[in-house]
Amino acid sequence: MKKILCAVLALAMMLTACLAMAETVEEVIAQAQTMTNEELYAKAIEESNGKTLYGIGNSSRGKTAGASFIEMLQKIDPSYTGTIEWSQPKNNSIFTTLNADIKSANHIYSMTLIQDGNQIQTKMLDTGNLLNFIPKEWAEGEGVIVEGNDKPLALQTLNKVFMYNTVGDKTYTNCWDFVAEGVAPLFMGVNSELVGKNFLYMLTEETYANYLKNAYDALEDGAAKERLAAVVKEMEPEAEALGLEAENAPYALAYIKLFCEQYNEQTDDGPICNTLVTKSAVDQCGLLVYSKLRSVEESAETSVNNIAVAAYQDGYQGIGGYAYKHYLQVLKTSPLPWTSCAFIAYMTTTSEGFAAWGKDMGGYSANPICMQDHSKDGYVDGVNTFDAKNDRGYEWWTSADGGRLVVEDPEYCAQVSFDLGDWIDMIVGSK
């Protein structure tokens, strides 16, 4: 009996020791942030050889990046047989899917590539369901734009920009022109793609409210400006009631109100682009993903030369559009945290890892090592043929002297969304 008891006690001690040695996902991330890519890749091979990492993301290109990552690991260790399975949920269901996996007894997903900073902040970061990992070689990389891209870690910034059809005589020289009387910009509904709603939240932040005020001041005096002035005046008590702190918040609310009342809701940016580049879309305008221009098929009726990017025009005043981000995060219940960290490092610190996204205009890595030059995408045989496709790059688009994009900040969106979201919904609902 004593021998049996001793054996049981010994086994219990061994199990306790094993559990003590088991690393939490948080502990893995803390260690991983001090390691080079080479060290991370070795850990990934050790952890996931013969296993499958399940990733989930808003971008289907994660599958391409995953295949490249596995190929790279196999070059390091030809005996490595790990795989990556990537899925892309539909209809904004990614948050539901992730939370269900985290709460389940059988955890499947290890990491995610996710958009919508507001929901990420409130549903995932504030709750601790998603964990941020910052690769050492990213944080210490030369020229990496760390601020604004580290909390949470951004794989890329994408832009949606104001464009207009140039077949007619109408021009748009000021961002307020897109909410002028009778103008109806083509735009995805704010509740069908929530990054668009985040754009509206961000307009009330001081920097962007100031952009709108400066653009308003640049408008010529007359009936059109008087119409806007009346709406701004109407918004002064609203700004106070909503607790907005920016001095020029009434200008932001006026812009939001008019934009929501007037935009022509579309199901997707692809159809918006396909409409605007036709000869028949005279004087129409829209706010859409810049990279859609890459897919335009030239014909007698359709051409990239039938549209203009508003911010590229000389003398343009105000915001040129908005920027949202794809964020890389590790689930707190990740079955393969080391491999997740290594995969994230691969995508954010190597040109091969970012290639699935970097091959197109309109998507920007914070790491210059990953970026490809798209400044001459509109050139054909050395001739500037489609000027609108010549991407001026992240720094130009986000600068006060350039495109003045409204850049998503998850913390700010989360701060104002509760009340401001309802306010926007009332406007949209009354259209």
Task: Write out the residue ranges for each language-model feature.
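Short, low-complexity disordered leader/linker segments with a strong preference
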Residues: 1-49, 431
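Conserved C-terminal helix/tail region of periplasmic/extracytoplasmic solute-binding proteins
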Residues: 23-33, 38, 391-431
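Short, polar/charged alpha-helical segment
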Residues: 34-49, 59-81, 162, 296
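Extracellular/periplasmic catalytic domains that process cell-envelope and extracellular macromolecules
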Residues: 46-47, 104-108, 146-147, 153-157, ...
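Loop/turn elements at helix/coil->beta-strand transitions in domains of secreted/extracellular proteins
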Residues: 49-53, 79-82, 107-111, 182-186, ...
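Extracytoplasmic ligand-binding site segments that recognize negatively charged/polar headgroups
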Residues: 51-71, 84-97, 107-271
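Extracytoplasmic/periplasmic substrate-binding proteins
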Residues: 247-251, 261-333
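Mature extracytoplasmic/periplasmic domains
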Residues: 322-407
